[in-house]
Each structure stands twice: as C-alpha cells, then as structure tokens.
Amino acid sequence: MADLWLQFLLTIDATLRVATPLILCAMAGIFSEKSGVIDISLEGKMLMSAFVAAAVATLTSSALAGMFAAIGVAIMLGLLHGLASITLRGNQVISGLAINILASGLTVTVGIAMFQQGGQTPNLARAERFRPIELPFAEQLGGIPIIGTIYREVISGHNILVWIALGAVLFTAFMLTRTRFGLRLRAVGEKPEALDSAGVSVARTRYLALIIAGILCGMAGAYLSTAHGSGFVREMTAGKGYIALAAMIFGKWQPRGALLACLLFGFLEAVASRLQGVELPLIGQAPVD
C-alpha cells in the first residue's frame, strides 16, 4: 500500500513537470486569443526558444542567460506574427503555420552549423541548467505520513520555472479580470471598433498581448531544454504547442480551465511514461514505444 501511495505521488510530481511548458504556452495563447489574434505559432515559438536557450546556455554556461535569450527570440517571432496578421492584415493561421515551419527548419540548420551534432546541442552540465529547489526540511518532514510525503515528493524538488508556470496562471487571471489592460484586451478581441472609437489603439493592445505571449513561450522553451532536459534535440517540442492550444480551447479560454486541461494532459503523459515496461493485469507488459 505504501509503495502504491509513493508511485501515485511520483506520478503527480511528474505531472507537474510535464505540464509546465503546456501551462506557460496555454497562458500565452489566452493573451493572444483574447486580443483577437489566433496564435497557431505557439509551437514554433516554443521550439525556437528551446534551441536558443540551450545554445546560449552552452556558450555562456548560464541557464539564466539562455532563458532571457529564449524570451527575446520568442518576442521577435511574436512581433513577426503581429506584423503579418495585425499590420499587414494577413491570414493569422497561415502566418502562425509559417512561423512553425520556419522554426522547425531553422533550429536544425543553425544547430548543425554551430555544433555539428545533427541539429542537437551539446549536453548541458548540471551548473548550466535550472536546478531543482529543495524546500526547507523536505527530508526531515518526509517521514511524516501523507503530509510529509506530499511535501517531500510533490511540492519540493521543482525548479524555478515550474513555480513561475503556476504563478503565470494567477498572473493571467489577475491581468484579465482586475486591470484596465485586461479590460481593454477583452474588448479588443470582442468589439475592436468600440475600443477604437474610445481612442485606444487596437493594434498597440494586440502587440502588447503578443509580447506577453512571447515572454511566456520563451520560458516554456527554455524549460524544455535547460530545466526538464539537458540540451536541445530536433523537434523536441513534439507538438506541445498544439496541445497547449487544445488545452486553452478545452478550458474555454479561461486560465483556470486551461490549467486543469494542461494538468490532465500532463497526467496522461506521466502515466504513460511510468507504465512503460510495467506488467499490467490482463494486458501484460506495457510497450516502451
């Protein structure tokens, strides 16, 4: 029974780790979509950010420098999407898909040119990554039934980006419902002509939303390659941007709903990962691939 309880807690712990980039990207998508901009480019921004974060961390031996570089490139891609879809009034879906295709090809091409490892970056040393944060007295309290075990196995041991992702949900909810910017953001997505007649720039509001989305996508990409992983590999996002987009829609474009959807997708992936090679009743050993 104790082993079953521990396995359950480890699965919840893995759920939080797997769901972190989904949460960050889903919050980014909410900002974009609330402003009236369809942001299919979440996948591309996260992929490019993951590569840049790993590359800069390799060159500077600093995960923090890699994250800031990742945020910068994600903002640039967001502004590129804004230029095509807001200023030039192009098709937003095509613009987003173009960024995804650009990121997919550019990360491999530049990666091969820089590191000659088939589009990958060298493995990052422990000091070049975001390290887990052990909370005070985690080991000492771990022996306490239920509460102590939860504190040690689930709450403690996450890196800073996991906590930032959870904080991003509160930030998004606060910005959308408690600030003047959030009111304008929702208005520009629902009735842009009304906001324009009130003297507020629709384009400026949408660009600000894309910048915030770029910051969140940049952190999601940096998490994949410098926190959850130890470097960049080709197509390492593996469709997580699209999953985050689906989670946002599943959550009805609300931060709380999107969070629950991301945790659900993360839980399913964590369960699938932990069941690999495990003997199951009536089924046998779960396949590895």
Language-model features, listed with the residues they occupy:
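Single transmembrane alpha-helix segments in multi-pass membrane proteins
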Residues: 10-93, 97, 249-253
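Membrane-interface helix caps of multi-pass small-molecule transporters
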Residues: 31, 55, 59, 79, ...
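Short loop segments and helix-boundary regions at transmembrane helix junctions
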Residues: 34-38, 77-141, 178-180, 238-239, ...
